[in-house]
Curated annotation (Swiss-Prot):
The keyword Amino-acid biosynthesis does not apply. It comes from the Eukaryota. Its main location: nucleus. Expressed in Rathke pouch, in thyroid, and in the epithelium of the pharyngeal wall and arches, whereas it is absent in the epithelium of the pharyngeal pouches. Residues 43-52 have a biased composition (Basic residues). Keywords: DNA-binding, Nucleus, Phosphoprotein, Transcription, Transcription regulation. This is Forkhead box protein E1. Phosphorylated. Residues 55-149 bind DNA. It holds the Pfam family Forkhead. GO terms for biological process: cell migration; chordate pharynx development; cranial skeletal system development; embryonic organ morphogenesis; hair follicle morphogenesis; hard palate development; positive regulation of DNA-templated transcription; regulation of transcription by RNA polymerase II. InterPro entries: Fork_head_dom (IPR001766), FOX_domain-containing (IPR050211), TF_fork_head_CS_1 (IPR018122), TF_fork_head_CS_2 (IPR030456), WH-like_DNA-bd_sf (IPR036388), WH_DNA-bd_sf (IPR036390). Disruption phenotype: Knockout mice die before hair formation. They exhibit cleft palate and either a sublingual or completely absent thyroid gland and show neonatal hypothyroidism.
Length: 371
């Protein structure tokens, strides 16, 4: 192998760099681009977006705060904020309207701005925007060049001038949907929007049943819809689990009563119920006279006067305060079914069935066994 056929030596690095630079200059000259710009674009990083000429050095939050601070009422609509910015800074007037989206986003996403609903009689449309009173010191000494810190509202209850009462609004909304289901303890909404709603109904008084007293007997009838007479009082229970029924006084003001005691056996599965006529403190009301009140009967039936000896033929006259015929008037014919007091079953007293009292408190006895 001779020296003439040997491969040429590799070029030096300086020679390669010079060749590349010459080629880049030739390409830039052909395209009309300066060589300095071509070299910076090829080897350097991407340039940042150039600053727009004439753009004010204020953030969008600062622009909004300036507009609200210059308003006579210290509040502006969205259109009023746009107008202030375009009149004060020509940059936003001549450029596209993309900045308006940023204004809207900053209004809704920052806690330092409060939305105030427009009054009913005020013309125009749109809500008002105001600066939170606790956020007025966000900018140092009135300078809006830079925000000092992000404002975060922690307690909404400290701004009663701008925030509605959530509880009252919820009560008014519930009254609109269910007019009779508003609790009595919650007052009506004082605002003009909900002024047409009726005041809430009074809640029923609590029911109280002494554990030591025997339960009420099973009765034939429904809970009366008429109010009870104010002259009725509580009926004392007889010993041994017997039932005491109401009896009307023979004469007004006599204060006497004649309890009738159940003597037969009670049904096997009594579905007793209790008619709730309790006072505010949970006890049964005490009337002016001593006439008895049958607590669980739901209707009143009792002997108006002592039975005449043999004159009535075994039929006992009863008093029904609700204009209905009591089964007690047919005691002779329905001897095994009804007792003289007008109650279903000839049974005597027994313990109150706790399971039915728990499952059906204050309900009507709908489970009457077939005769």
């Amino acid at each position: 192998m001779t020296a003439e056929s040997a491969p040429p030596p590799p070029p030096q690095p300086e020679t390669l760099a010079a060749v590349k630079e010459e080629r880049g200059e030739a390409a830039a000259a052909g395209a009309g681009v300066p060589a300095e710009a071509a070299g910076r674009g090829a080897g350097g990083r991407r340039r940042k977006r150039p600053l727009q000429r004439g753009k004010p050095p204020y953030s969008y939050i600062a622009l909004i705060a300036m507009a609200i601070a210059h308003a006579p009422e210290r509040r502006l609509t969205l259109g009023g904020i746009y107008k202030f910015i375009t009149e004060r800074f020509p940059f936003y007037r001549d450029n596209p309207k993309k900045w308006q989206n940023s204004i809207r986003h900053n209004l809704t996403l920052n806690d330092c701005f409060l939305k105030i609903p427009r009054e009913a009689g005020r013309p125009g449309k749109g809500n008002y925007w105001a600066l939170d009173p606790n956020a007025e010191d966000m900018f140092e000494s009135g300078s809006f060049l830079r925000r000092r810190k992000r404002f975060k509202r922690s307690d909404l209850s400290t701004y009663p001038a701008y925030m509605h009462d959530a509880a009252a609004a919820a009560a008014a909304a519930a009254a609109a949907i269910f007019p009779g289901a508003v609790p009595a303890a919650r007052p009506a909404y004082p605002g003009a929007v909900y002024a047409g709603y009726a005041p809430p109904l009074a809640a029923p008084p609590p029911v109280y049943y002494p554990a030591a007293s025997p339960g009420p007997c099973r009765v034939f009838g429904l809970v009366p819809e008429r109010p009870l007479s104010p002259d009725l009082g509580p009926a004392p229970s007889a010993a041994g689990g017997s039932c005491a029924f109401a009896a009307a006084a023979g004469a007004a003001g006599t204060g006497s009563f004649q309890p009738a005691v159940c003597t037969g056996a009670r049904p096997v599965n009594p579905a007793a119920y209790a008619a709730a006529y309790a006072g505010p403190d949970g006890a049964y009301p005490q009337g002016a006279s001593s006439a008895l009140f049958a607590a669980a009967a739901g209707r009143l039936a009792g002997p108006a006067s002592p039975p005449a000896g043999g004159g009535s033929g075994g039929v006992e006259a009863t008093v029904d305060f609700y204009g209905r015929t009591s089964p007690g008037q047919f005691g002779a014919a329905l001897g095994p079914c009804y007792n003289p007091g007008g109650q279903l079953g000839a049974g005597g007293g027994g313990a109150y069935h706790s399971r039915h009292a728990t499952a059906y408190p204050g309900a009507v006895d709908r489970f009457v066994s077939a005769m």
